[in-house]
Amino acid sequence: KAGWVIILNIVFLISCLPVFTIGTAVTSFYYAMMKSIRRDRSYPLLEYWSSFKRTFVKGSMVTVGTGIWISLIWYLWNIAAVSGEETGLFLQKFYTGLLVVTGAILIYLFPVMSRFTMKLSSMVKLSFVMAVRFLPYTAILLAGLLLLVFVWFRYLPIPMIFIWPGAFCFAGTFLMEKVLRKYMPAPAPGEDAWYYE
């Protein structure tokens, strides 16, 4: 399984190269990791590309929208930083809070997209509810991701990028599935409900 995780990791990184496909790539990465690696269904690459095609439009929309949103917040944060006044300091903290909330929503949004079929706006709302309701999980996942990125940039060799995203995704499924199951309907009789195993 470790070999498949590395292969999926490489495919994931290649899929992110167009940039606007990052959201779709993350969604498909989680889907294949959960279904094929953890639940031994089908082939990882087959499931990855199946999810990629299915979520391409929504995933791309999220990526572009998030890029614009974060760029706007960063721009406003820098304007507030230049002001050097109490109001500017308050606004910096406010914009930082918005970034944290955005990150918390995104942590759940891509797994939600991989599992549920609904409007994108409904997915965002559901992800926000999950982030608040399961705040300890949200904190662990966000802190873990930030810590991994920091450690990789500061201490680990560059080639580790071919390992750590897959390792984080695999580990993250154990917490994420506990959350997703709370919102999933009971499986129909005869259904291959791999996500309930």
Language-model-detected regions and their locations in the chain:
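Helix-coil boundary and N-terminal low-complexity module in membrane systems
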Residues: 1-95, 102-197
